[in-house]
Amino acid sequence: TKPPKAGKTHAAPEEKAAPPAPEVPPTPRDATRAEKEEIVYLDLSDLHPFKDHPFGVRDDAEMKSLVESVRNGGVNQPALVRPREGGGYEIIAGHRRQMASQLAGYRNMPCIVRNMTDDEAILAMTDDNLRQRETILPSEKALSLKMQYEAIKHQGARGDSAEAGKLSLESVGQRNGMSVKTVQRYIW
C-alpha cells in the first residue's frame, strides 16, 4: 500500500454501534385489541347503523366525492363493526363508507369485527367521527360530546359522582382538544 500523502491523515475505522434493542410494545389497555384483528368483507345487508348514531349520513357533495372514490379505488379504510345479538353487525365507524359502497354498486365492504361494550363502542364511534369528518353540525358535535361524557362517566362510576363527572369533562376535553368550559357549553 502507498503511504499517506503529506497533510492527510487517515482516521481509524469507526466501530458500528450495535442496533438498539427492539422496543417492547405496550400492553393493550383494551383486551379486545389483544387478539389479532383481520379485515373481512361483509355483505352490506348484514351491516346495521349504530343505535343513537348522532351523525347524519347525508347525500351531499362530500358523499358524491366519496362514492366516486369508492368506485375508482374501493373502500380504503375498513369499517369498524361489532356483532349484534340478533345477527349481523352494528357499524361503529363507517356509516358513510357503507352508504358510499351501496351507491357505488358494491355488495360488500371491508370491515374489522371487534367485540366491544356499549361504552367502548360509543367512544370509538365518537372519536372516529369527530376526528375524520370534514363537516359536523353543532348539534351533532354536542350530542357526540355528551355521549362521550356519559360513557367515560359510566366507565369510572365509582365513588363520588360529582368528582367522576368533573374528571369525565376533563377527559372529553383532552380527547377533543377542548377546554372543560368549551365541552360544558356544548353538552349543557
Please report, for each region that a protein language model flagged, where it lies by residue:
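Amphipathic, charge-rich alpha-helical segments that serve as recognition/docking helices
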Residues: 55-57, 63, 98-188
